[in-house]
Amino acid sequence: MVDEQPTTQNKNGVIRPGDIDIGDIVLVCKNGFKANLKEIIVELNINEDIFSPFIYGELSLVDTHGLLRYGPILGAGEESLLVTYNTPCTDPVQLEFVIYKVKDRSKLDRDSTEAYTLCFTTPEAIKDKEQKIYKTFTGKTYSDYAKQIHKEYLKVEGGPELEVTPTNYITAFTSDGWTPFQCMK
């Protein structure tokens, strides 16, 4: 006898745990150009990794509209990707990512149809990579330093708050060119 998965849909239209209902995937360019990419996506991968502090992913698409030209999409941290989704257990979630690279670009026909992959990550990852801290921290706990570093160097407007487990002992350390996340480790 085969176990059958329940087929009743919840309010989000998903059937099984692990199902994801993608709402919108909107490209926002620096010049104000916006486009919903949902209908031209071939594959979307969003990765959370226990060895990485930041979410990252790739979006492969077949572009019949010439978005690389009209956006333009440079992949140098100038464009944003807004992803909205639902799961069986959550209300709608909207995540903002920064596109840092365009790869695997290939022309599919003589017109403007192209296939390519957009590589993206969180805005905090870009800020972390761009900054080095040369500073001595004294008179606080490690959890207080983590909150301070997040607020001063990584926090983005509308971004998530940092959840930190309180620590007990007052300590000091010196950052000699570490990134903000290296200081928070």
Protein language model annotation of sequence segments:
Residues 1-127:
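Assembly/oligomerization scaffold segments
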Residues 110-185:
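Charged- and aromatic-enriched interaction segments used to assemble
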